[in-house]
């Protein structure tokens, strides 16, 4: 259409379209007019006209609406609008319009005549006389009659064309075009079609899956649930029954063969006519009596009453091969079979395999609740009833589904079959994988003949073979190792509690109830072998005898059963009491001690674990509990979901130690007490050192490298750290500093073996506590490993290079890191923890270990407060490092020398430059400390003064400097001699490169004057 239509043309076209579909248009208006006011919004009026009549351009609709006094801000009386439209077009609407009240009454009267089920939505008494199946059948019939109208109405309620409408809107549409249903019944009805009241409805998918358009004419003749089923009587009699059967089973041959094998696992075995007809009705086609009789004349010409399955399967395979060579061009039609026939074959199949079916159900319901998840139930049904389609499965679940939880009441299904309780022989639960493999591999077993198969199930279960002692012991071991709940429950039915004892008579009854009957001689031998005493045996005593491989009292050890599959162990749920019993043992098997378990569980390294961390630890130990059982487990431990544990509390749980009066639970003090928890980690590391020093001093001393001039061993910070890491006891830098301060109380930087052992509470023995026997080299009376200085120099150089690379990367990512910090700081405190800072840097592309990050922060002078960092200071430090590196060379001399980025070779030279340029200031600072003017200050005070003048001098650089001067073990340093002769030392360092053998002797002479014994 290239030009706009005139007003007259619009009136004629709209009028013709409206009055051809006047009933549908009126229903659409009333659908929108929920409150029955007779008014709709102008936008809704236009949407109805464009949906049911014709599309209008904006200028056309503006012209049309102006003529009928329709304004954007005023509601429209659609009855008046239709009357005016009819008057302008000289049409008579009396047959469908008239008074609005009369129209509503007539509409209700017509709705009441539609079906006997129709009535007032508010009155549920009428609906109670009909089952949900009856309602569904009539509902489907009415929907098929109004399919196109419902489709248009749902499309009108989807202006965005997204394909979704609300559940309430769907109900309004269906109530308008079909009949009004009480909301409670409507929700139940929609659940049958897979719709939920809490989610948006994909109305296109609903209509497509619920009712195909090409089946409208068929569905008008009968209920929709059978609209796709094959009515054999409607087929031509001239068509051969075999040809028809093959046509219907073309895409279902695999399911048909599997169903036949489930009924008869022997491929060439016979099958009764009734069984064969059930399978055909479910999987392929529902045959009439005459058609089935015609088929039997071909498959059973001798009228023996049985069908040879191998012959029929061969016919199917031959038909498939022929169709592959000459494909059929006819369109395939999916078949939805009658539910009555499907339900009958399902019940019959379950009854034939009752024991295996019940065992598999119980393997998913260890607590015997009678409930099973929908997905698990579907897996089981596909094993036993592979012919079950999704539509049939939904139909089955709708009858036995628990409305509250959505789970399946499988005991209700068993009751429908006529089984009120468990099978005659109590099931012996085995892993689900084993059940599946056993059932799917039935063709490997010998199948009894037809006469024996047709006997009642009860006759088979009563004939039970007597078991030997070895077989029973084998089963016992399997029960205990797999934690079989059925056997344990039966045992506790007699003993009442795990510690309660049962007598010999009750024990034999347990064996018989669990499918292990024995004769008197074998039973007497069994009680002797398992150590059954006169006073009886408890379940705990019984289980303990089978947990360890060498069972007590056994003359011959039976072969070990196969270890249960990992999938079974992971899915095996246990009770809170079982978890309480297994937790300490599993912890010892998986971890060396409680500290290792706590360290692995405490992922954020804050010294605190919550109940989520504890639950994750249980899963790691293969202790799987449901959520409610986990809460019960916490209750047995005296805990709640909201509490936290420090290491001491966790250790008490693992080792079941009584609380001491000085060990108040940390959660009673405050939720997070990180300082106390770091001390607990230090205490654990200290206990490790105590144990090693007492029992394995030779292993511990391998990490101690130095002795003093008298041959006594000395320890430094890195020696203790290397020892802890060698024993797999890593500590955070903050925790290690606390531990080192515990030993280095005088701040000398080193301690002797005597001092170290005294801190450990061990008496020093010169004969035992000796340094590790290695070659040492003498430097000024101190024996140090020759490689030590080289290793430390290399380590210091590597750390400096890493720090420079990290600084460059942080400069490049400065903006991204700043945004990430701002986003994570929701409380706007400007502080974040070290762990979170690590995580943010890693996400931004700069991965640093805690040690590297700590080194970087210390080099930039960024302080920490309770293991938290002010990220604004951190960002400022990054900016300053960036600006410092970008300054021109002529300004570098005016800036203080930063030692953070210097390599080890430059440290001594730079300190010498600082000393030369700041002689007077250094002398003043040392004099302030040396108030008595002795010329000596403590080594710690000496280091602090140097750090004040040497910008960002690191601890490892300072200690390297002291060892380079050979004064790292001196408690007091002559600062006056240092200021006067330090430049001479630097000159001798240069000479030593060419005259190393002379330098050592000269070095002794130069620095002997520094040291006062």
Curated annotation (Swiss-Prot):
Q: Name the Gene3D superfamilies on file.
A: EF-hand
Q: Where is this region: Disordered?
A: 441-460
Where does the chain bind Ca(2+)? 602, 604, 606, 613
Q: Which domain of life is it from?
A: Eukaryota
Q: Per its UniProt record, what PROSITE patterns does this chain match?
A: EF_HAND_1, EF_HAND_2
Q: Name one Pfam family in it.
A: EF-hand_8
* GO terms for biological process, alphabetical: flagellated sperm motility
Give GO terms: molecular function aspect only: calcium ion binding
Sorted alphabetically, the Gene Ontology cellular component annotations on this record are: cytoplasm; cytoskeleton; nucleoplasm; sperm flagellum
Q: What protein does this entry describe?
A: EF-hand calcium-binding domain-containing protein 6
State the organism of origin. Pongo abelii (Sumatran orangutan)
List the gene name: EFCAB6
């Amino acid at each position: 259409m290239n030009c706009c239509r005139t007003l007259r043309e619009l009136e004629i076209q709209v009028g013709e379209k409206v009055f051809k579909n006047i009933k549908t248009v009126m229903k659409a208006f009333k659908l929108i007019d929920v409150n029955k006011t007779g008014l709709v919004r102008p936008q809704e009026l236009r949407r109805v006209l464009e949906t049911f009549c014709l599309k209008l351009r904006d200028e056309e609709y503006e012209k049309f609406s102006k003529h009928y006094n329709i304004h954007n801000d005023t509601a429209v009386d659609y009855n008046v609008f239709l009357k005016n439209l009819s008057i302008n077009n000289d049409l008579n609407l009396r047959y469908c319009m008239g008074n609005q009240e009369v129209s509503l009454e007539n509409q209700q009267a017509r709705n009441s005549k539609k079906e006997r089920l129709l009535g007032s939505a508010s009155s549920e008494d009428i609906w109670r006389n009909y089952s949900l199946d009856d309602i569904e059948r009539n509902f489907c019939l009415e929907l098929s009659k109004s399919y196109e109208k419902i489709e248009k109405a749902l499309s009108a309620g989807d202006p965005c064309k997204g394909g979704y409408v609300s559940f309430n809107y769907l109900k309004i549409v269906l109530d308008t075009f079909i009949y009004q249903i009480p909301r409670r019944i409507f929700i139940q009805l929609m659940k049958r079609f897979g719709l939920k009241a809490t989610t948006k409805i994909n109305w296109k998918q609903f209509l497509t899956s619920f009712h195909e358009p090409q089946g409208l004419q068929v569905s008008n003749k009968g209920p929709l649930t059978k609209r796709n089923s094959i009515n054999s009587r409607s087929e031509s009699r001239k068509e051969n029954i075999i040809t028809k059967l093959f046509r219907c089973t073309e895409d279902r041959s695999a399911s048909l063969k599997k169903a036949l094998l489930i009924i008869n696992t022997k491929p060439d075995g016979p099958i009764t006519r009734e069984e064969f007809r059930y399978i055909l009705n479910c999987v392929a086609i529902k045959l009439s009596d005459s058609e089935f009789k015609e088929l039997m004349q071909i498959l059973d010409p001798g009228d023996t009453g049985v069908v040879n399955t191998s012959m029929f399967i061969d016919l199917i395979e031959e038909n498939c091969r022929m169709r592959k060579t000459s494909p059929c061009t006819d369109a395939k039609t999916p078949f939805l079979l009658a539910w009555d026939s499907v339900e009958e074959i399902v019940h019959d199949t379950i009854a034939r395999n009752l024991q295996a079916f019940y065992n598999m159900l119980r393997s998913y319901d260890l607590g015997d609740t009678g409930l099973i998840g929908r997905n698990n139930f579907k897996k089981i049904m596909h094993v036993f009833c592979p012919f079950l389609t999704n539509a049939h499965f939904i139909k089955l679940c709708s009858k036995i589904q628990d409305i509250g939880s959505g789970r399946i009441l499988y005991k209700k299904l068993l009751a429908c079959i006529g089984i009120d309780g468990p099978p005659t022989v109590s099931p012996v639960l085995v892993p689900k994988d084993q059940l599946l493999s056993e059932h799917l591999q039935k063709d490997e077993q010998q199948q009894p003949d037809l006469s024996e198969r047709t006997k009642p199930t009860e006759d088979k279960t009563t004939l039970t073979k007597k078991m030997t002692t070895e077989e029973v012991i084998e089963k016992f071991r399997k029960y205990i190792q797999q934690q079989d709940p059925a056997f344990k429950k039966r045992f506790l039915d007699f003993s009442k509690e795990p510690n309660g004892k049962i007598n010999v008579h009750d024990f034999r009854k347990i064996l018989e109830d669990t499918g292990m009957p024995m004769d008197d001689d074998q039973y007497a031998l069994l009680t002797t072998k398992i150590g059954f005493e006169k006073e009886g045996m408890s379940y705990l005593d019984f289980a303990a005898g089978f947990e360890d491989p060498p069972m007590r009292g056994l003359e011959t050890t039976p072969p070990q059963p196969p270890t249960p599959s990992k999938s079974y162990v992971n899915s095996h749920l246990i009770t809170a009491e079982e978890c309480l019993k297994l937790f300490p043992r599993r912890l010892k098997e998986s971890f060396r001690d409680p500290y290792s378990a706590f360290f692995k569980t405490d992922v954020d390294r804050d010294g605190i674990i919550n109940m989520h961390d504890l639950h994750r630890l249980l899963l790691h130990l293969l202790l799987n509990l449901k959520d409610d059982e986990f809460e019960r487990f916490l209750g047995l431990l005296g805990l709640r979901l909201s509490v936290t544990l420090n290491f001491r509390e966790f250790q008490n749980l693992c080792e079941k130690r009584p609380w001491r009066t000085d060990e108040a639970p940390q959660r009673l003090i405050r939720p997070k007490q990180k300082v106390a928890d770091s001390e607990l980690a230090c205490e654990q590391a200290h206990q490790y050192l105590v144990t090693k020093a007492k029992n394995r001093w030779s292993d511990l001393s391998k990490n101690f490298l130095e002795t003093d001039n008298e041959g006594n061993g000395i320890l430094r910070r890195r020696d203790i750290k290397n020892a802890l890491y060698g024993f797999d006891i890593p500590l955070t830098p903050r925790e290690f500093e606390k531990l080192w301060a515990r030993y280095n109380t005088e701040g000398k930087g080193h301690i002797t073996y005597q001092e170290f052992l005294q801190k450990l509470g061990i008496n020093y023995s010169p004969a035992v506590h000796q340094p590790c026997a290695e070659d040492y080299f003498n430097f000024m009376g101190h024996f140090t490993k020759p490689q030590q200085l080289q290793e430390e120099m290399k380590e210091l150089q590597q750390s400096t290079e890493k720090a420079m690379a990290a600084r460059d990367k942080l400069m490049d990512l400065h903006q991204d890191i700043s945004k990430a910090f701002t986003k994570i700081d929701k409380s706007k405190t400007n502080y974040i923890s070290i762990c979170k800072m690590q995580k943010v840097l890693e996400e931004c592309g700069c991965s640093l270990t805690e040690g590297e990050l700590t080194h970087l922060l210390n080099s930039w002078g960024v302080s920490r407060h309770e293991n938290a960092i002010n990220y604004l200071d951190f960002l400022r430090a990054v900016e300053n490092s960036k600006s410092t590196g970008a300054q021109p060379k002529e300004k570098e001399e005016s800036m203080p020398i930063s030692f953070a980025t210097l390599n080890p070779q430059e440290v001594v030279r730079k300190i010498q430059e600082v000393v030369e340029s700041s002689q007077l200031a250094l002398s003043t600072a040392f004099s302030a400390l040396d108030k008595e003017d002795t010329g000596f200050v403590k080594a710690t005070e000496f280091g602090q003064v140097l750090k004040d003048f040497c910008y960002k001098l690191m601890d490892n650089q300072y200690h390297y400097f002291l060892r380079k001067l050979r004064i790292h073990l001196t408690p007091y340093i002559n600062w006056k001699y240092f200021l006067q002769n330090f430049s001479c030392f630097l000159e001798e360092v240069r000479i030593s490169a060419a005259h190393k053998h002379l330098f050592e002797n000269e070095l002794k002479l130069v620095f002997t004057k520094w040291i006062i014994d």
